[in-house]
Swiss-Prot record:
Transmembrane segments: none annotated. Gives rise to a blue or pink color to bacterial colonies. May have hydroxylase activity, resulting in the observed pigment production. It comes from the Bacteria. It comes from Rhodococcus sp. (strain ATCC 21145). Its EC number is 1.-.-.-. This is Pigment production hydroxylase. GO terms for molecular function: acyl-CoA dehydrogenase activity; flavin adenine dinucleotide binding; pigment binding. The keyword Cell cycle does not apply. Pfam families: Acyl-CoA_dh_2 (PF08028), Acyl-CoA_dh_N (PF02771). Keywords: Oxidoreductase, Pigment.
Amino acid sequence: MDITRTELMDRVHALVPAFAERAQKTEENRAPLDETITDLIDSGILATLTPKEYGGLELGLDVAADIVRTISAVCPSTGWVTSFYIGAAWRVNIFTEQAQREVFADKPYTLTAGTAAPLGQVQKVDGGYRITGQTAWNSGSVHAEWFTFAGVVFEEGSAPTPLWFLVPREDVKVLDTWYIAGMSGTGSNDISVDDVFVPEYRTGPFALALAGTAPGQLIHPNPMYHLPFLPFAMAEVTPVVVGALRGAADAFVQRTKDRQGTISQEKASGKQAAQMRLGRALAAADAAETLLDAFFERLTAQRPEQSDPRDRAEMKLKAAYLADLARNALNDMVRGIGGDGYRNSAPIQRYFRDLSVLSVHAFLDIDTASETIGRFTLDLPVSDPLL
């Protein structure tokens, strides 16, 4: 596959009107529509980060961010699932080369869902492991072909070993649990496994992945694949936040132009308060985009300190700050949308709910991220399993 960044972005922009039109149906469906997944596959978007060795595009993380930000501006749920499906091609490289080749055997993309939350039971057996448990927040589960699970192996005389497990869809059960106020269209259902056998080659050393040094990562010469897990995960979620904020600001502009008082019949656009609130919204969207660009510049700079937990914590805080900025901006906007702005058909209320949920995601929680940096700064113990 050989597509330039410009060609790929042209394809993305061509899909945006359809994704915007489907936004409300996506929310009602609680997952992306089948035709949306088909569009993502046929356009080549999902091969953005797949190594060229497996037929992918192997474009930069900044390209993936542009794609996700653009889609999220019209439908944050679609942008979120797109980001995780694109990112799955990177995360698969945490596993062995044999597992990678299995996943990409017949196509240059992978529909993979999963979380980093540990399973309840992992047992070492001949040739692999048996896993049992249930995990939540599996975005993209409805269309996923593979699932990833984290777990800790306890063997007598050895330190606990955190591993990642790769499991085909036929070995898991997707539970219909995704009923939530925001990001409703992501299909982030619970997933369960019951005494499922996972061969050794479908496991990855999660502790090494946290530092970007899993053997499966290192077989690829492109340094993009050598990033630590957490900063990469931040690179998946932050473009959704920034795109959603831009979409909200655009929706607020339109809402301000259209809104008319019920009693006075005065147009909202003629009020100084509305004009000031609109200015703040646009400034916040611009600031978020600038901060996102700086985040990716730092992420891709190939700095030696990237393997240091403090540096990873700083990247997490930068991402959380972006989410906090977006939520505060939305809180300000919705004070000026009137009652009609909360109708189900009004895009602005969907952005408000989506960003409210995004901002409390485990990776984007400002309180936790701030506390961690505070503890590092004060030379206090830090216990974050993802650092």
